[in-house]
Amino acid sequence: MRTRYKNTYKEFLGACFLGSVTLLSISLWNIINQAGKNHSYKAFIEFDSAYGIQEGTAVRLRGLPVGKVVGISQSSNSILTSIEIKSSSTIIPKTSLIETNQTGLLNDTVIDIIPLSKLSIDYSSIKAGPLSGACDNSQIICNLNYLKGERGLNYDDLIRATTRISQRFDDPKLFYGLYYLIGNMIKLSNNFVDLTEQIAYMSLFIRLQLENLKEQ
C-alpha cells in the first residue's frame, strides 16, 4: 500500500514538473516573440533635396506615424536620409510612393509612405518580417533597404506659382490680349444675334407664304 502511494506521489510530482516546464516554455516563447515584434528596423531614402527634412522628422504610413528620421547625409547630387521604423510588425509594401509633404500651420515637413499595392499575408517571406533573413525585398521593405523618395506638397512651390501668376497679370501684353479677345467675342456675339434675327424673319416670311398658298 505504501509502495503504491509513493508511485502515485512520484507520478503527481512528475506531472507537475512537466506542466511547469510547459507553461514556462510558452511564457518564454511569447516574451521572445513579442520582443521580436517590437524591434525596430531601418531603411535609407534618397531625395534630390532636403525639403526641410531633419533628424526627428516624422515618417508616416497611410497617415499614421510609424517612425522617424535618425540621420541625414549629403552628397554632391542628393540627400540620403536614414529612417527608423519603430516596430518590425509594421510591414510596408515595396511598391509604395515615398514623398515629402508639409503639414500644419508651421509647415512641418513629414515623410509620407503611401502603399500602391496590397500584400498577401500568405507568403512566408512576408510573415517572417523585415528583420528576417528570408525577407523578400521585392515584396516588402526589408531592413537596410535603399529607397527613392520624391517631392510632394510644398508651400514654397505654391508661393512661387502664385508670384508667377501675379507677375503675369502685371504684364501689359496680357491685358491687351484679353481686351482684344473680349472685343472679338463681343463682335461674334453681335453677329450671332443679327444672324438669329435674320433666320427668324426668314422663317416668319416662309410661314406667311405657306399660309397664303393654303388659302388660295
Curated annotation (Swiss-Prot):
Recorded GO MF terms: lipid transporter activity; phospholipid binding
Keywords: Chloroplast, Plastid
Main location, first listed in the record: plastid
Record-level GO cellular component terms: chloroplast inner membrane
InterPro entries associated with the record: Mce/MlaD, TGD2-like
Subcellular localization: Plastid, Chloroplast
Organism superkingdom: Eukaryota
Annotated protein name in UniProt: Uncharacterized protein ycf22
